[in-house]
Every structure is written in structure tokens, then in C-alpha cells.
Amino acid sequence: METITSRQNPLMTHIRRLAGSAAYRRQTGQCLCDSPKLLREAAQWGAEVQTVVSVEPWPEPLPEKVRQVLVPPEVMASISPAKTPQGVLFTCRAP
């Protein structure tokens, strides 16, 4: 698991672009979800989760290929599409 503290990190920039642009989501073939419940359901149903970004370590098992990133709350607030971030968001391959 890695830790990112900069809002200017390339991954954080990528996530902000996913949150703000449908054209970018189509171009990359990725979607962005902001919810612990959605992450649990995606993992349960075998969705291709690519990156999990959270303010606390995710307590449930994820496939080894999933990139797990810890960020401070202020970075989460800057990348989350939600007005009140739930503390975890993830990218996955768009269906």
C-alpha cells in the first residue's frame, strides 16, 4: 500500500479528470465510484477494480492487482466528486 500526500500527484490529477469529464471516462474506459458500499459490491461481483483510494486502510481483502493508496482527508476532499466524501473511492473498468 502506498501513501500520497500531494494533490498534484499524477494519480490524483487523473482521478479529478475522471470525476469531472464524461469524455475522459469514455476515453480511458474507466469509471469512478465514491462509496464503501459500492466497493464491497464491485468486489463481490467481480468488477475489474483498478485503484482504491482511501483515508484509512481498506479492511476487506482485495485482489493483489488492485492498487491501494492512502491519502489524507484534505486530498480526498480535493479528488472526490461528492460534497461529503465517504473516505473511499475507486476506479474500475467501465462496463
Predicted features and spans:
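Arg/Lys-rich RNA-binding interfaces used to dock onto structured RNA substrates
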Residues: 1-95
